[in-house]
Every structure is written in structure tokens, then in C-alpha cells.
């Protein structure tokens, strides 16, 4: 689950992570009133959307007067902001964060992530703040420093100080930076985050260490422990199809292609998308029906896939382990009839009760193209979509 910058900063502030003062506003008039509450001569007007790259896209403005705050607020509210993370459709700006300006001396990047290779939380930092960390990793990887954290000990003060030294935090601010990083680590652990990222972290002319940004994602599997965080969810920022999928315990992520995919298991889903790409197709989605799919679940999965008007064909790739192939086949037949599917459909089944599953598909009399392997299925759906 993602949250807005202003929500992330509120969490930071409550747990001892230093951030500038700021207020959220929903209208231009409210933006001016909120700016008046801040003891500042310079204001930062920030678009609040669930995407990075806002600054480069024109979603962050520096205002030197209340009249400029109003001008920028009117300019941004209601605008569709397109960044490298939103896709070409962009996201509508429905709220702003009005923040006090500060005397920035230097910008840095810091982030806590889960390193799958070490099964540990890892602190990453760089003195190349203000730019995308992926860009830094590609061009100057030597400027990224990492600390792997022992889950029993937590982020040790010496590790925090070492990172601060490595990214050239001024000597007089080293201890503040180390304390800042330890507090940020506590946010990551106590709130069950999957990522906490600040870009930029800054040092000021007064020697302060502040978070000028806040990207916080939470582990969905741990949200049941955090009712307060669940309340921060902004459904307007999420894909309606993803919201609908979550109601049926389906994992759905929309992509830019035209071949709908329905698979069980995240690994098989990714392999399926890779195979479609390999044969010249473009997946329209990632959709994992999980290990306990029912007829109802399969039907809803079809409806969600077909909710994307770009979809021109569907590839169902199921390995029946716990989930039996005959049950899946019955679900596919029922779903095709209910949604009155007219698009090309290729189905590859393998595993428990696979022969019975294939018989059910064949006996249905529906236009379902069978495939014996994932590669064959991918080739067939790519060909059918191109011929359609």
C-alpha cells in the first residue's frame, strides 16, 4: 500500500524523523490559508500523487509570496501530471502540500529496502540526491553505499555514522544524520514497511538534517496490524481494476500491452509475461488468481481483464497443484459464457486432473484454443491477437 508524501511525513514527525513544517490543502484558497500558518518567507507547493518524478514534471513549485502560492495552487489543482512513473495517462492533482522552505546546503538520497539476496533490510545512501537512484546506479554505482542490517541488533549507530561519512555529510552534522537514520529505520520496522525512501534528504545552513520528501510503501500482508495506516489509503489514486481485484483476493497490476494474462502463482505469472514478450507480444496485465481459485474467482478475473479496453486476447496459464485443473476448466467455461467472450482465448493447463480439465474445455463447444506448453500458448495468443 502506498501513501501520499504529507501522510508519510506525518508518520516521520511522530517518530522523531525531522521534516519541515507543512499543511495539506484541497483548494487554492485553502493553500493560501495554510501557507499563512507557516512561519516562512518561502513556500514549496507540492502536487500530491502516488508517483515519483513530480519535480521534473512541474509538480513542485517554489513560491516567494502568498500570491504566488495562490497562483501555483490554481495552476496545479485539477491538472493531470505526467511523470515517468504515472504512464502517459498521468494522474490528476486533487490535493497539495504547502511546506515551508529551507536553506538547502546539499541534497542526498537515503532509503531502506528489503534485499532479497541477503534476506535483510538494507540501508542505501548516496550524495547524489535529487536524481533518480536508478540513474545513479546505472551511471555512477560507486556513489551508492549500503549497510546490511542485522534484524536482531537493528541499525547500529556505527553503521549510521559510517553511511553519513561515506556520503560526505558535513562533520558537524554527522551525529544528527546518524540519529536521523536510526529513527528512519524504526519507522521502517515498526510500521511494517516494504520501502522507505527520502530523495532528497538535505543538510541546511543551520546544520539541520531534514527529509524534504517521503516515499513510504507498506507490506500489505501486515496491514491488519495497523488500522491507522489502513485509514490513510487513497482509493482515488489506485487503478479501479486493482481495487476490484483485491475484493476477490486477486493480485492484479495493469500494464500497457494488449494480451490479458490469468495465471496462478507470481513466479509463473512473471514467466508467462516474459514468454509472451519473447514471442513478440505485450502483456496487458499481471493477474495471479492464487492457489484457491473458484468458479466465481475465475469469472471475476475475466471481468477484470476485460475491463481493460486495450485487451485483444487472453492467455490462461494454470499449473494445478492444490488447485485442480478440472475445477479451473469449469470456471473458465462458466466465465466465458457469462461474459460472452468474443476475444481470442488460449488455455494451457498442467497438473492435477489435467486430462479431465482438457475434456471439459473441449466438450464445452466454446472457441477455446488449447496449448500443451507455455511456449506454445504464448505463440498462439500472440499470433491470434496480431491476426484479429
From Swiss-Prot:
InterPro entries: ATP-grasp, ATP-grasp_succ-CoA_synth-type, ATP_grasp_subdomain_1, Succ-CoA_synthase_bsu_CS, SUCC_ACL_C, Succ_CoA_ligase-like_bsu, Succinyl-CoA_synth-like. Substrate binds at residues 264, 321-323. Keywords: ATP-binding, Ligase, Magnesium, Metal-binding, Nucleotide-binding, Tricarboxylic acid cycle. Residues 9-244 form the ATP-grasp domain. GO terms for molecular function: ATP binding; magnesium ion binding; succinate-CoA ligase (ADP-forming) activity; succinate-CoA ligase (GDP-forming) activity. SUPFAM superfamilies: Glutathione synthetase ATP-binding domain-like (SSF56059), Succinyl-CoA synthetase domains (SSF52210). GO terms for biological process: succinyl-CoA metabolic process; tricarboxylic acid cycle. Signal peptide: none annotated. This is Succinate--CoA ligase [ADP-forming] subunit beta. It comes from Staphylococcus saprophyticus subsp. saprophyticus (strain ATCC 15305 / DSM 20229 / NCIMB 8711 / NCTC 7292 / S-41). The gene is sucC.
Amino acid at each position: 500500500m502506498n501513501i501520499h508524501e504529507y501522510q508519510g511525513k506525518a508518520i516521520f514527525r511522530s517518530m522523531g524523523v525531522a521534516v519541515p513544517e507543512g499543511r495539506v490543502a484541497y483548494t487554492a484558497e485553502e493553500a493560501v490559508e495554510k501557507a499563512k500558518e507557516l512561519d516562512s518567507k518561502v513556500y514549496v507547493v507540492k502536487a500530491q500523487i502516488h508517483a515519483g518524478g513530480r519535480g521534473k514534471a512541474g509538480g513542485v513549485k517554489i513560491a516567494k509570496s502568498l500570491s504566488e502560492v495562490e497562483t501555483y495552487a490554481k495552476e496545479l489543482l485539477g491538472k493531470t501530471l505526467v511523470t515517468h512513473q504515472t504512464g502517459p495517462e498521468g494522474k490528476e492533482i486533487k490535493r497539495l502540500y504547502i511546506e515551508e522552505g529551507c536553506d538547502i546546503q546539499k541534497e542526498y538520497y537515503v532509503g531502506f529496502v528489503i534485499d532479497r539476496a541477503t534476506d535483510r533490510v538494507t540501508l542505501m545512501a548516496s550524495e547524489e540526491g535529487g536524481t533518480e537512484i536508478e540513474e545513479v546506479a546505472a551511471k555512477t554505482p560507486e556513489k551508492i553505499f549500503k549497510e546490511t542490517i542485522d534484524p536482531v541488533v537493528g541499525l547500529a549507530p556505527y553503521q549510521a555514522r559510517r553511511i553519513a561519512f561515506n556520503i560526505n555529510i558535513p562533520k558537524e552534522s554527522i551525529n544528527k544524520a546518524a540519529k536521523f537514520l536510526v529513527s528512519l529505520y524504526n519507522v521502517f520496522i515498526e510500521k511494517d514497511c516494504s520501502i522507505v525512501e527520502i530523495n532528497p534528504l538535505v543538510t541546511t545552513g543551520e546544520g539541520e538534517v531534514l527529509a524534504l520528501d517521503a516515499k513510504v510503501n507498506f507490506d500489505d500482508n501486515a496491514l491488519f496490524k495497523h488500522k491507522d495506516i489502513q485509514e490513510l489509503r487513497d482509493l482515488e489514486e489506485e487503478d479501479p481494476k486493482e481495487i476490484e481485484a483485491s475484493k476477490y483476493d486477486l493480485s492484479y497490476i495493469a500494464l500497457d500491452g494488449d494480451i490479458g494474462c490469468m495465471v496462478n502463482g507470481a513466479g509463473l505469472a512473471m514467466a508467462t509475461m516474459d514468454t509472451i514478450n519473447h514471442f513478440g507480444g505485450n502483456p496487458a496485465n499481471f493477474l495471479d488468481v492464487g492457489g484457491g481459485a473458484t468458479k466465481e474467482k475465475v469469472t471475476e478475473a475475466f471481468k477484470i481483464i476485460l475491463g481493460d479496453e486495450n485487451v485483444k486476447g487472453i492467455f490462461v496459464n494454470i499449473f494445478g497443484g492444490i488447485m485442480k485443473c478440472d475445477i479451473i476448466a469449469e470456471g473458465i467455461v462458466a466465465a466465458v459464457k457469462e461474459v460472452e467472450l468474443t476475444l481470442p482465448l488460449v488455455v494451457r493447463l498442467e497438473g492435477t486432473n489435467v486430462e479431465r480439465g482438457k475434456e471439459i474445455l473441449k466438450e464445452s463447444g466454446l472457441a477455446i484454443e488449447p496449448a500443451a506448453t507455455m511456449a506454445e500458448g504464448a505463440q498462439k495468443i500472440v499470433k491470434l491477437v496480431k491476426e484479429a
